[in-house]
């Protein structure tokens, strides 16, 4: 549940930068990052100085810590309805999802402060900013030396850990939503419906020449926000980061030589490849919601001071560009909402939804900056984040190479009018609602034209991942008259998150509810998948069963 918001009254006097509260890195010359108590103290200081901000909690962690958020806008708003009345883009920026990756947390605190206390016109005149600086608050408090918790990172001296207190990777949890942090963020997404979601991270991998790398939503199912961010926002951000902020940035990825098997073509030995497109990752998930997701990855081999500076600059430029393109972004998100509303009523309007994809095989060829790493011959000497026996040279060169930065569909599905779940699938219905999806319930048995899925094979992963043995199904859809019992759950695709409905409920989806074992007790080779596809939800579509022609659906309340 979204916490109550406290608003600070306007600042009574003009402050100078000398009056501003300082983040933990600023106070320690970037030797240290903020503890949870430091973040709370910093936010309390902003409130005490009457910064024009609103403060709240998105929810609690499993260990009971509040997850603070801050709202900044001019005029100041404190509720989602007030924000929507302004008609501006809402930008949700999150730091510290992986608590060892610290610069997002500290950069976001500093940026909130600087924007709030600025007396000059700035982005807050054109957007609503929601900042969540310490999302993985429990993981943040498990401090240990950087050499233990973040071996490939150049400081600070002590950092938190990647997972939350339940040992869950929060950036693999957006579909199954098992962590309280994830459930809290989904509630914020549903309540505020941000147009843009920015997730702040630090890289783990290759030695390249960029202060920061970025990615849009990579899933081909992100047909609105993913493509718009890739083609219209991120190229502009790249240029502005270079010319305005003196930082070289590039599309997120690693050198193929550092990640064997990243591409199918084993004859390619030098290239650059991005990461996984599935919606378990937050920014990929957000694109399938019909919004814009942007991943930010500071360069782990840079110093903490430089990582904070590059992340600060990147978020600042994102906010500036969103402010400039506010009308276009609001129009895009409105179209993303309206397109699925016709599904089931106008078959010609239905757009195929990608549920499985693969890395492109025809990459772009681009210049990529590499750093030369040398063998030192002395395994006793180490540099932070550098393997023993190797050393950074500070020598960079530009190499022309293939860049694999996007995915193409391998399996599409046409959205039906609705999916129907068995009356006993209450856990699935509850999780769908948590994703902001409307779920109805039939009040009597009925029949309708549709199709059922026959399971030919069940492929279960031998190893656990995030506490699960992931499942993949193979089979076939077969058309026919479907008999549906009373109290069935009905999930129409004609709703703003219609594409997400398809992705989560299709049995062959590469990251749907089937993947995460939500239907395991109902799966049998040769049997029927427990979710049915219905072609027509209208009274005419149900006319095949005259006894139930008067059936209606009622919204399930609990």
Annotate each language-model stretch with its function.
Residues 7-558:
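Structured catalytic-domain cores with a bias toward divalent-metal coordination
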């Amino acid at each position: 549940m979204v916490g109550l918001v406290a608003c600070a009254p306007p600042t009574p006097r003009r402050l100078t930068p000398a009056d501003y509260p300082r983040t933990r890195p600023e106070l320690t010359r970037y030797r240290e990052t903020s503890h949870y108590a430091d973040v709370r103290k910093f936010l309390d200081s902003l409130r005490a100085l009457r910064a024009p901000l609103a403060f709240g909690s998105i929810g609690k962690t499993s260990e009971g810590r509040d997850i603070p958020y801050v709202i900044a806008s001019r005029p100041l708003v404190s509720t989602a309805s007030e924000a929507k009345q302004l008609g501006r883009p809402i930008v949700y920026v999150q730091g510290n999802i992986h608590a060892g990756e610290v610069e997002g947390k500290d950069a976001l605190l500093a940026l909130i402060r600087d924007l709030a206390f600025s007396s000059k016109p700035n982005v807050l005149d054109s957007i609503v900013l929601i900042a969540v600086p310490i999302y993985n608050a429990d993981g943040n408090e498990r401090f240990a030396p950087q050499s233990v918790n973040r071996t490939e990172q150049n400081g600070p001296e002590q950092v938190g850990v990647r997972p939350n207190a339940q040992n869950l990777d929060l950036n693999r949890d957006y579909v199954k939503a098992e962590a309280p942090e994830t459930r809290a963020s989904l509630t914020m997404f549903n309540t505020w419906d941000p147009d843009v979601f920015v997730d702040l991270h630090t890289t783990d991998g290759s030695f390249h020449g960029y202060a920061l790398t970025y990615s849009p939503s990579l899933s081909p199912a992100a047909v609105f926000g993913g493509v718009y961010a890739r083609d219209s926002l991120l190229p502009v951000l790249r240029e502005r980061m270079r010319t305005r902020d003196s930082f070289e940035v590039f599309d997120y990825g690693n050198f193929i030589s550092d990640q064997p098997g990243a591409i199918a073509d084993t004859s390619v030995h030098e290239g650059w490849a991005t990461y996984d497109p599935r919606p378990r990752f937050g920014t990929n998930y957000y694109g399938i919601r019909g919004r814009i997701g942007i991943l930010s990855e500071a360069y782990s081999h840079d110093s903490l001071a430089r990582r904070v500076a590059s992340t600060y600059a990147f978020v600042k430029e994102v906010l500036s560009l969103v402010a400039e393109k506010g009308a276009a972004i609001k129009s895009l998100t409105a179209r993303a909402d309206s397109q699925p509303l016709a599904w089931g009523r106008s078959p010609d309007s239905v757009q195929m939804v990608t549920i499985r994809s693969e890395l492109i095989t025809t990459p772009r060829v681009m210049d990529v900056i590499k750093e030369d790493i040398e063998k030192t011959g002395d395994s006793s000497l180490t540099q932070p984040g550098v393997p023993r026996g190797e050393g950074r040279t500070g020598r960079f060169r530009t190499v022309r190479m293939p860049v694999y930065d996007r995915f193409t569909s391998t399996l599409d599905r046409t959205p039906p009018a609705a999916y129907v779940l068995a009356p006993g699938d209450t856990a699935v219905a509850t999780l769908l609602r948590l994703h902001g999806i409307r779920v109805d319930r039939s009040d009597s048995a009925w029949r309708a034209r549709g199709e059922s899925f026959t399971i030919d094979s069940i492929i279960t992963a031998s190893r656990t991942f995030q506490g699960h043995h992931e499942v993949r199904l193979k089979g076939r859809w077969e058309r026919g008259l479907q008999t549906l019992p009373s109290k069935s759950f009905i999930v129409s695709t004609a709703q703003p998150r219609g594409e997400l409905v398809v992705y989560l409920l299709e049995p062959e989806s590469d990251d749907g509810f089937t993947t995460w074992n939500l239907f395991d007790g109902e799966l049998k080779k040769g049997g029927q998948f427990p979710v049915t596809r219905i072609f027509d939800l209208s009274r005419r579509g149900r006319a095949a069963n005259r006894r139930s022609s008067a059936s209606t659906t009622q919204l399930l309340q609990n």
